């Protein structure tokens, strides 16, 4: 991979919540996390850990792969 290519991992948590009619507040209550943390994840400002992604997938009853979008830039 060249120096100007890197893998960027983005989540589609905001879309997954919207598809199920769920809110950031609902997810924060399910996971015991702050709404601010959920908001930052949804905005892709920070990424949840793999463990957290597994917990989110479980709560939303989706495959963890459905929460990720891999792009190259």
Model-found features: residue ranges?
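Short alpha-helical DNA-recognition segment
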Residues: 21-40
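The alpha-helix within a helix-turn-helix
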Residues: 17, 28, 57
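Short, basic-rich loop-to-helix N-cap that marks the start of a DNA-contacting helix
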Residues: 45-55
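A short, Lys/Arg-rich alpha-helix, primarily the initiator
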Residues: 1-22
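Residue-level detection of the helix-turn-helix DNA-binding "recognition helix"
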Residues: 18, 32, 43-45, 72
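Residues within the helices of the helix-turn-helix
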Residues: 14, 25, 54
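Short C-terminal boundary/hinge segments that cap the last helix of small helical domains
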Residues: 61-73
């Amino acid at each position: 991979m060249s120096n100007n290519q890197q893998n960027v991992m983005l989540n589609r948590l905001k879309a997954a919540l919207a598809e199920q009619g769920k809110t950031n507040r609902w997810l924060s209550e399910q996971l015991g996390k702050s709404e601010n943390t959920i908001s930052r994840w949804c905005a892709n400002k920070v990424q949840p850990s793999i463990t957290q992604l597994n917990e989110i997938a479980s709560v939303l009853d989706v495959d963890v792969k459905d929460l990720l979008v891999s792009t190259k830039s």
